[in-house]
Amino acid sequence: MDFLRIDEDRKFMSRALELAVRGMGHTRPNPMVGAVLVKDGRIIGEGWHEVYGGPHAEVNCFAHVTEDPKGATLYVTLEPCSHYGKTPPCADLVVEKGVDRVVVAMEDPNPLVAGKGIRKLKEAGIFVTVGIMEEEARKLNEVFLKYITQHKPFVLYKAAMSLDGKTACHTGDSQWISCEDSREEVHVLRGCYKGIMVGAGTILADNPQLTARTEGMIDPVRIIVDGHLSVPLKAKVFHEEGENIILTTTASDEGKRKALSDMGVDIIMTDGEEKGSVDLEAAMTGLALKGIDSILLEGGATLAASAFDAGIVDKVRIYTAPMIIGGVSAPGLIGGEGAPTIPKAIRLRDVQTQMTGKDLVIEAYVEKEAKEEKAESTRPTDVDLLKREEEPCSQGS
């Protein structure tokens, strides 16, 4: 019987997760959330958080019910909120509608919620199950989770290379290593991240626009790492619509900083150990304070090396083209000194692969600390969570 319920719970939670994805790129800095209302094994209502500041998933779900929700089961990918923000508490609405049971994929780590919504439901006599498809829910909102708990942006390093690890020929020619399908996918990816980061070298070499160029997607904030302010004022990025932020140092020219500021460019100054080098770790805090919850890192080998050395990269997505470029002097993916020994190499986990057009795409998470990995491995299974389903708290407890 328990296994039958687990199958049913996973079925409807999967649907809720599918709905949540529809809010991608539109709800930040809030999470993507989906909700499904089920009665007698049938879906009678669906909804998702569509846009920041708009009705939450539960509200939209109840707004589209096809019959009386009393006695139904609500599946929601994130714990219902219990506080007044831009919208009233969703937990109160769930209680008001007479739902018998609520299945939650994961607790909300936001200190304003953090279990309070679940407790409110239990105190109202509602059965609550927490943790069904939690891993999938956490991955969906990985950006939100880091931003709300560590107050730093989630960083994805994206790059394209040949099969032998080259990002360009020895002449500098790199158009195009990745296939058209991959390039189109990258424009969609840009719209899913709040900021896009490159180094001064990329601006000087390619003079890119750094826009999403996909209908319906919001252009990212352009973040340029330039310790000496070597990028010219006439660069395309400074004359495109949208926001620009430059990460620089006190070694940069004060007059040029003022000129950029007069053009509407935000300046963040953080000095690294070497003169003219940007302290990327400190810069992440400054970017978070400006509302940057996520960054797509598209810089070259030098910036990539600095980012990995600073420990700011959370995830990688590498497009590998079926070609061999060769050449000792042809640039590779990561610059810098590199790992001195194999045990010191950066390790990746949860590796996934897929084909995008002719390119092999590898996506994985950067392994941070052993204690984080251990915490992940000890997370309870769906069966454990179902066995631990608690009785509702008594009224007034």
Where are these regions (language model features)?
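Zn2+-dependent cytidine deaminase-like catalytic core
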Residues: L37-E136, V221, E241, I245, ...
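Proteins enriched for Cys/Gly/acidic motifs involved in redox and nucleic-acid/cofactor modification
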Residues: H26-T27, G54, I118, I132-A160
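Short capping loops/turns at secondary-structure boundaries
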Residues: N110-A114, V130-M133, I148-K152, Q175-C179
